[in-house]
Amino acid sequence: MEAFETFITNVTDFVWGGTWGDKTILPVGPVVVLLLGAGLYFMVKLKFRPLKRFIPALAEVWAGRKGDGDKSKITAWQALSTALSGQVGTGNLAGVATAITLGGPGAIFWMWITAIFGMALAFAESSLAIKYRETDKYGRVNGGPMYYIKNGLGQSWGWLAVLFCIGTLFSATATGGMVQANSITQSVQETSRAFSLPCQLSQPAIKGIRLVNNGVAKADQMNKADLAKVSACELETSNPDTLVIILEDVEGSDTLVNTASVEAGSNNLDTVIANWLIGLIIAALVFAVIIGGIKSIGSVAGKVVPLMAVAYIGIAFVVILMNASEVPQAFAAIFKGAFGWSAATGGFTGAVLAIAIRAGVDRGLFSNEAGQGSAPIAHAAAQTKNPTTQGEIAMIGVFIDTILICTMTALVILCVQGDFVNAAGEPVKYAYQAAGLEATAITNAAYASAIPGGGWVVTIAIAFFAFTTIIGWSYYAEQAVTYLVGEWATKLIRYIWVGVIFVGALTQVGFIWMLGGLANASMAVPNLIAILALSGVVLAMHKKNGDPDTEDGDSIMLKGEGVE
């Protein structure tokens, strides 16, 4: 198993970073080149339409709330919300923190670049999704990359459509389903444990042994005092099975920070709420939504996603205002790090630049999914006959996900100061510099340091973000299965999906997290090949439907085009 995990890690490192083990094969990963290259190509060829048409696109989003009355489809607003339900997930919390940890603050700049170019990719792929969607004999709309591959490139490209569908099922099961359910479970457990810590203040302690509520924990470092008392106790955020115990000797002359791992069999850290119960609740809620298909998913997403996004942005904005003096240095760190500046060397290094690019692009795609091919599956179900209108609405989703929500998370992490210690035992200001913290734990620590009960902000955000991601990706999985085996499997996959979610809530998903980068690439590569091959069609629609440099472009509509 270890050899297999090493192999998967090496493959993922190569496709995203160009490295294999300790060897550098390419300066940048091939998927990064393909993603940024395709984004730059479409941005230039579309004459920077995503930037020029940004304000009109916002108006189209607002107008899309009403729809055209076609009951076989969902409104443009609901399509955007469904796509956002898949885009806005744990990547907006854990992914941002991971990008900063791996690539430094400069990784955020490359997340922005990925998003800006991604807006052009979102326009291209969602426009194609409308043009080449199909309506089956039951009146259901089916669309997405597999359909614009089949109907746009022809049957000879069917193998690419199949590859995309397999990649979709891989990504849906791993990052869109099991990981999200597990994130909810872990978040609920960690927060509930925070209110029932198995630790009593000022409890006598003997060197090397911690007696805690009749359980036994062994301290790693207790070499400065033979007799000590507990002055503080909390769970280690990154590892809920570990207590961080701050000890003082009896005379109070020394303060010792010790990590105490709970001995196997101890009941100190028994889960407060059974994982199976949390999993059952998640599965039941998911089933209640997805059993009604895209109409039900779109209806729920159209209400929940805007509310959760506005609430999270609002809370993050307040935290940033409270730390406004740190904002200038946060942006300085982002821009310096983006181009390879290293605090350690006091200069610019190529290695720092490469790491920042890799981390930013990788986590950026994981968050906004632009170019991955998932969002156009949702946008294909929209009530519109104008492909480019929905394409413009789709690019707003990328902006909301990365430029707004991810940036808010990044600024909270980079601005909020707290009492943290790095691996060398030295005090540091920020959570992302601290030892023992990673992913969501960094974001959690930043909010907890900023406001009372800040950990609850992350817990609630994860619960909502992950839940909406689960329902969004259920539809993507359903569409992939429908394409591969036919309409008869549509309802069957919904029941299977509920089972996947329940298992994900109960399972340790560390290895599945490792598959995330590979899963994203397995969708992105076939999709990017397809939209580049169909770039002529995209540019023709662009010129016919609202070329920003053509005065009367907006008045021209595509009528009857597509395969509906």
Where in the sequence are the language-model features?
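N-terminal alpha-helical transmembrane segments of multi-pass membrane transport
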Residues: 1-90, 100-107, 118, 502, ...
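Extracellular/periplasmic helix-exit of transmembrane alpha-helices
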Residues: 123-133, 315-333, 341, 345-348, ...
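Alpha-helical membrane segments and immediately flanking helix-loop junctions
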Residues: 69-102, 131-146, 150-152, 163-169, ...
